[in-house]
Amino acid sequence: MAKVIKINLIVNKRMSPAIILIGVLILIVLFVIKFNSSEVSSILTSEVTSEGDDEHETETRETTGCISQLNTLRATLAAKKKELKTLRTARKKECTEQLAKTQAEVDRIQAKIDNFSSRTKIVPLPGGEVGPPYNPPPPRTNTRPNPRPNPRPAQLPQLYNYGYY
């Protein structure tokens, strides 16, 4: 009985770092599962802002906020353009006032988008999403060094007078 208790204590002392590590990993996985990835990233960026350079972090947050705001503006613009198209096809006397109001809203939203894009230098991506400006990778260079000349050229084996001088 005493040997079993001693063995358990030894195993527990040796395994405690591994058990703690496994427990921490399980907690991290549960944390990530519980929250969405966007919430986790916002929590992580808020922790970084308290530690790091405030100007750079606020600029990053403003850029991501600008991107989401710009995407919502574009979505509302598309909806207003659809509404404008349906009003133009109707062309009744009652719709004239609504048509003018919707056209003014479309122009205002388009001006906001243009102002936004010029201020933040946001480039539309091929899928219609908006992302940061694209910087192409630098051109590839030859990474292998120039081959050095062989100091000793290879000699053919001397088959006929091998061992004879």
Curated annotation (Swiss-Prot):
Disulfide bonds: none annotated. This is Uncharacterized protein 084L. The chain crosses the membrane at residues 15-35. One of its GO terms (cellular component) is membrane. It is found in: Membrane. It comes from Invertebrate iridescent virus 6 (IIV-6). Residues 123-156 are annotated as: Disordered. It is a single-pass membrane protein. Residues 67-119 form a coiled coil. It comes from the Viruses. Keywords: Coiled coil, Membrane, Transmembrane, Transmembrane helix. Residues 133-154 have a biased composition (Pro residues).
